[in-house]
Regions:
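Heptad-repeat alpha-helical coiled-coil signaling segments
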Residues: 101, 130-132
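Residue-level signature of the cytosolic catalytic core of signaling kinases
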Residues: 61, 101-105, 162
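Flexible, nucleotide-binding loop/lid elements of kinase catalytic cores
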Residues: 47, 122, 154-156
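N-terminal Rossmann-like NAD(P)+-binding domain of SDR-like oxidoreductases, especially those catalyzing
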Residues: 1-96, 116, 126, 138, ...
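A conserved structural motif in NAD(P)-dependent oxidoreductases
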Residues: 123, 133-139
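Activation segment of eukaryotic-like protein kinases
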Residues: 111-117
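Mid/C-terminal beta-alpha module of Rossmann-like enzyme folds, strongest
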Residues: 149-171
Length: 171
């Protein structure tokens, strides 16, 4: 997973990168769509997560730099919306799949596909009871377009509302 290899750069993109992007959008009077993530919820205690759930994030855990970078991006985006009147949209993207996925990106679906293509047994971490929702890329693009064209400025979850356990998925 890239953010594990480049944690400082990940945090800089989440802070300096979003600040520069929002500043440019302000100057150009552009509407800006931010691609956030379901990882802002961390290890959720609520399933499925709704947009008003604040999450359960460990800021110094193994995923902390990514989770916190995205949470900061959302906070900065809402600040620009509130204080500068910038037209912003925040999409919290859940597990997306489709053509041209990287099979080694650390997510369960591409990992399973890669293992199956190599004729290997599927690796399940934990007891398999962890749940995920999967969203096909075409549905994601449709959701992003609809959000961008809407007047809604609060974060929006884009994914499949139905979750499946990793164990069930592996079967």
């Amino acid at each position: 997973i890239d953010y594990l290899k480049i944690p400082i750069q990940t945090l800089k993109v989440g802070s300096l990168g979003i600040h520069n992007l929002l500043g440019l959008a302000k100057v150009k009077k552009a509407r800006l769509l931010i691609a956030s993530t379901s990882e802002v919820y961390g290890d959720p205690t609520v399933h499925p997560q709704t947009e008003d759930y604040w999450g359960n994030v460990n800021p110094v855990g193994p995923r902390g730099v990514y989770d916190e970078a995205k949470r900061f991006q959302e906070a900065m985006t809402m600040a620009y919306h509130t204080y500068h009147g910038l037209e912003t949209r925040i999409a919290r993207i859940f597990n997306t799949y489709g053509p041209r996925m990287r099979l080694n990106d650390g997510r369960v679906l591409p990992a399973f596909i890669g293992q199956a293509l190599r004729g290997e047994d599927l690796t399940i971490f934990g007891d398999g009871s962890q749940t995920r929702s999967f969203c096909y890329v075409d549905d994601l693009v449709d959701g992003l377009f609809r959000l961008l064209m809407s007047d809604y400025a609060q974060p929006v979850n884009i994914g499949n509302p139905d979750e499946i356990s990793i164990g069930e998925f592996a079967e």
